Amino acid sequence: MPRPVTLFTGQWADLPFEVICAKAKSFGYDGIEVACWGDHFEVDKALSNERYIKSRLDVLAQHGLQCYAISNHLVGQAVCDNIDVRHKSILPARIWGDGKEDGVRTRAAAEMMNTARAAAKLGVKVVAGFTGSSIWPYLYSFPPNPPELVPNGYRHFAEMWNPILNVFDEVGVRFALEAHPTEIAFDIASAEAAVLALGSRKSFGFNYDPSHFVYQNVDYVGFIQKFADRIYHVHMKDAYLSPRPTEAGVFGGHIDFGDARRAWDFRSLGRGSVDFEAVMRALNDAGYTGPLSVEWEDGKMDREHGAREACAFVRRLDFPTSAIAFDAAFERK
């Protein structure tokens, strides 16, 4: 059976839930990965209003869609981050509160616990998202990092996320971290450290997204192979990395996405540098049968055109694994 092809609604949060569901169906998708921002899925309402979950399920059914995951990247970011003014623009007012760091982190952690509970009520087994990181600002070790600075960051991550993951365990939901710059895990080495910091508990895995590895020169196929049993969700997303030197390198030069001076940028699926044939074969080898969720980003392309072509691209690319050895027919019986 082909894997379901879904659309992540995070980049469509300016549209009402009913509208993006109708569009996703018209684009050819089997379902959606619902963002917990905009009006798409509101965690507080899901837990306080018995009719809210039914209203969401009714809209999905009306359009013949399934929901395979919900995502709460924005609130998750605040759990471990060093909180500053930037977070105010991405957090609900009830999470931001007075903006004091300890309070924001505490409220964000509680919201992630509630996100697991809301996912269970919706009948969803995976929550994708971010963790934030207290040590991301120390990525480039100058002035030199004291020896305990980074290990303390992983300990802080475990202190914040183990209680959250206890709730995930209680309700039978898994958390899938999207390894990404600014998170506790952003490549293979940091992902290994994050898993170990949590004692290798099974409720913590990854929302695999190759686009965030290609511009770092990380082995994005090797990531699947390394964490084959922890790939809980997959983002289909592409990025272009220039083969030639550019004015702004991997760090971005403080210039916006879409600027031609950048060394890399996100592109519609199949138009960047990711080898999706290799990705698909590695996912097959890993036994991944979950959704292939299109996170569509391309600042130079109309998003409806892009979402439609991305759906078709994934369908052409996906294929079932073989149940036989191709050369078995050569044997004499």
Question: What are these model-derived regions, one by one?
Answer:
Residues 23, 62, 79-206, 304, ...:
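Active-site acidic/histidine proton-transfer and metal-coordination neighborhood
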